[in-house]
């Protein structure tokens, strides 16, 4: 069961939220990222290891419970943030994190759709990548305008751009050696965009060379069928535009 603190967050926020993966494209956006200090931001997993991050995130979510180190808030330079732990009920609950239930079995965004729009919050289906899974918490909080960054899925991390192995130790970079995984992510984002638009929301990608937008067309090989799933906007242009409430 979700923690009471999570349930109390329902529809307490509005406007836009920037959700960050940990792709090394963030290193090319450092100047623009500094402007996010005045925005609602949701980061995840190994982001806390990027000590040069130019802003302190509003929210932090952890979905990879194998890495106990990530659960220690005191390794992060960004201590003043709300933390969420997404997992199965039988997983160990960390006292520094608000607990959010994850659905068991084959419950996935691409087949079951997003949750968080109604007055009850079901267990979260997986988005096949942490940022999309965590977006459902932001939907529950009331955000409807979303901008994604660092969604590449082809190489290392912002804190370790030359990494040859994923944090989980289960996947070798570049992840385009695993096209089924990337295709599952594409399908999940396509369903998420449609669900969000049906509720009056927007889903935009600000990842240069990303998996989900037109700028990534020349980046993907080895069996990946590139698909332009999300509209692309540069982060600089998004920062300039007026917030839609």
Segment roles from a protein language model:
Residues 1-245:
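Metal-ion/cofactor- or nucleotide/acyl-coenzyme-handling active-site neighborhoods
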């Amino acid at each position: 069961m979700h923690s009471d603190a999570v349930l109390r967050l329902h529809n307490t926020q509005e406007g836009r939220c920037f959700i960050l993966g940990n792709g090394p494209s963030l290193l090319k956006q450092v100047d623009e990222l500094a402007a996010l200090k005045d925005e609602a931001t949701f980061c995840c997993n190994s982001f806390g290891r990027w000590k040069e991050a130019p802003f302190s995130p509003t929210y932090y979510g952890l979905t990879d419970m194998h890495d106990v180190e990530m659960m220690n808030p005191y390794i992060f330079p960004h201590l003043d943030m709300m933390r969420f732990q997404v997992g199965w009920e039988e997983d160990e609950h960390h006292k520094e994190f608000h607990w959010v239930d994850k659905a068991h079995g084959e419950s996935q965004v691409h087949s079951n759709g997003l949750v968080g729009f109604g007055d009850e919050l079901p267990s979260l289906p997986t988005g096949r990548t942490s940022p999309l899974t965590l977006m459902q918490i932001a939907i529950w909080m009331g955000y409807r305008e979303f901008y994604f960054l660092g969604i590449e899925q082809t190489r290392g991390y912002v804190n370790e751009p030359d990494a040859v192995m994923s944090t989980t130790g289960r996947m070798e970079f570049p992840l385009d050696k695993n096209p089924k995984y990337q295709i599952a992510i594409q399908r999940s984002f396509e369903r998420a965009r449609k669900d969000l638009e049906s509720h009056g929301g927007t889903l935009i990608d600000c990842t240069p060379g990303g998996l989900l937008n037109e700028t990534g067309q020349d980046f993907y090989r080895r069996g990946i069928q590139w698909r332009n799933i999300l509209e692309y906007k540069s982060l600089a242009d998004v920062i300039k535009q007026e917030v839609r409430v």
